[in-house]
Each structure stands twice: as C-alpha cells, then as structure tokens.
Amino acid sequence: QLVSRIQRPMLDAARLLPIFVNSMTSCERLMELEKLPMEEDVSPITLKGNIGIRFSDVSYSYSEKGRAVIHHFTHDFKPGSFTAILGSTGAGKTTLIRLILSLITPTEGKGEAYTSEGTIALSPALRNNFSYIPQGNTLFSGSIRDNLLLGNPHATSNDMRQALHIAMADFVFDLPNGLDTRCAEQGGGLSEGQAQRIAIARAILHPCKVLLLDEATSALDIETEKMLLKNIKQHFQDSTIIFVTH
C-alpha cells in the first residue's frame, strides 16, 4: 500500500510531463509571434485580367549576416503558366512563396505582379488575388463543410461537391455524414492524404488568379497526384499556378 501511494503521484507526474513540454513549446511560439512587427492594415487591391509574377535579381536572407536563402533570383512566372519548383529542403522554395505573398520582403531586388493593364509591386494588398495551400495539415476543428466555407463563405453544397471532385476528394460523400462529418484539429479522424485533398478543395473554392501549392500533395501516391494536378490545370486554365515539390 505504501508503494502504491508513492508510485501513483510519480505516474501522474510522468503523464503530465508531455503536456507541460507541449505547453512550453506553444508559449515559446506565441512569444515569437509577439516579437514580429505589426503589419500595416491595407485595403485589398483586386487585379483585373490574368496575372503574372516577376522577380528581378531578388536575394533574401533571414538575418543580416546569414547566408542568402535566395541569391540573385530572376524569373518571370507568365500569366496562365504552370511552373513546378523543385529542390531539396532548405533550398528556398517556401521562402519564394513567402516573397510572393509579401510575408517577407526581398533583401535585394524586387518582385512585382503584372497584368495587361500594368505592373504593381508585390504587397500584402494583393493577397486576395492568390489562393495558397501551405505545407502540412491545415484543417481546423469542425465539420468538413465549415473548413470548405473558409475558402468561400458563399459556396453552395454543389460548389463544394465540384471542388472536392477536382481535388480527388470524392471519398467525403462516402462518409456517413458527408460534408457534415466532424474532424478534429489538424484533420484528426482523417488520413493525411485525405486532409490534404480537403485543404486543396478549400483553395479551389477561393476565386483566384494565382494558385500557390507548397508541397500540398506530399501525402498522396503518384497516380492520385498526377490526376489531381491534371484536374487543377483544367480548372485553372487562365490562372498562374506555382507548384512547389521535392
């Protein structure tokens, strides 16, 4: 009996340790966010016509004395083009996406968007023209319908069905509750591949002229990925697509 009295508190403490570590990690991340400079609130600018993205001699480093992640990069992502960006981890692929979204600004050089009507420097005001699918699982706690409506609050059930079909996510309609199926934070209850396809469907629902996919198909098998990219090309025929992969 004495042994059990000693063991029980120790076991309880051992169970609490992972929770404590996770909590501390979360606190550290929140503290990092607090240190970030506040972004100025700007009115969105909607560009008319097909959009191209052009970088001229762009370099970027995450610190003043650090190695340049992107070094004198020049490229023109022409309107309506489909571009695959390949490279190993740390090669600067995600950094390029962040530059397009103006989450960071070039250390050197310039980035700009252009249409047949003119050219404008990349800025936070242009983000409404883009649809972005980041790495990892980006679903939120709630129903599949709730997650899809984040892409377009006015989407109908038919719109969602079409987007899910394009994203190779017809499996949703085989689930007992269909669109009203609940998923936990980060798509809990779904496989990673299923969660990725729902995230892609959400991006498809968002009207955009530029689609950015940052390793958004990493959990899919090759055949499913091929079919998905084929569907995306057909659906976004007039949009500029930038696809980041390994």
Q: Which residues fall in each region the model found?
A:
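Conserved E/DxxT/N motif and adjacent residues on the DHp alpha2 helix
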Residues: 32, 39, 149
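Conserved NTP-handling cores and scaffolds of large molecular machines
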Residues: 10, 37-38, 137, 152
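Pre-NBD coupling/linker segments of ABC/ABC-like ATPases
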Residues: 38-48
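Cytosolic ends of transmembrane helices, especially the final helix of ABC transmembrane type-1 domains
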Residues: 5-33
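Phosphate/oxyanion-binding loops and surfaces in catalytic or ligand/nucleic-acid-binding neighborhoods
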Residues: 33-37, 167-170
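ABC-type nucleotide-binding domain
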Residues: 49-246
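Short, hydrophobic secondary-structure boundary micro-motifs
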Residues: 14, 41-43, 173, 183
